[in-house]
Regions:
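Short alpha-helical segments enriched in small residues
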Residues: 5-133
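Oxyanion-binding "anion nests"
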Residues: 1
């Protein structure tokens, strides 16, 4: 999802004035190393959870060294593999965080193939962001 979001944003002329940076953190270790997600959060709730995206968004704000006013964090099961009864393919958590405020976490279950789930995630994340800005 992160790559699609950056592509969607960077297609707009002048986007470099509003997009500071992005993080691709597929592995749990990268979430810990790059965004400061706590190991305990990952152990208790898993990578695909509201708690994890909340910590990811907070970590992105911190990692921006004061440059970012907003952070978008996404984690999900895009498929075709990786889903189970508790966390099916299509499950996505999105957190939009404004610096200094509590993040808004939303849970979605999207339908379709991997590309479709990722596309729907990007569109929903950007829609959620525009509602807050």
């Amino acid at each position: 999802g992160d790559v699609y979001k950056r592509q969607a944003l960077t297609e707009i002329p002048g986007s470099s004035s509003v997009l500071s940076r992005g993080f691709v953190t597929y592995s749990n270790q990268s979430k810990i190393d790059m965004l400061g997600v706590r190991l305990k959060t990952l152990e208790l709730h898993g990578a695909v959870s509201g708690q994890t995206v909340s910590e990811m968004a907070s970590g992105a704000i911190t990692a921006s060294n004061g440059e970012a006013d907003y952070a978008i964090a996404v984690s999900g099961v895009a498929g075709p593999d990786g889903g189970n009864k508790e966390k099916p393919v299509g499950l996505v958590y999105i957190c939009i965080l404004k610096k200094g405020e509590v993040g808004e976490i939303k849970k979605y279950i999207f339908r379709g193939d991997r590309h479709s789930v990722r596309y729907q995630t990007v569109m929903k994340a950007l829609d959620n962001l525009t509602q807050l800005v």
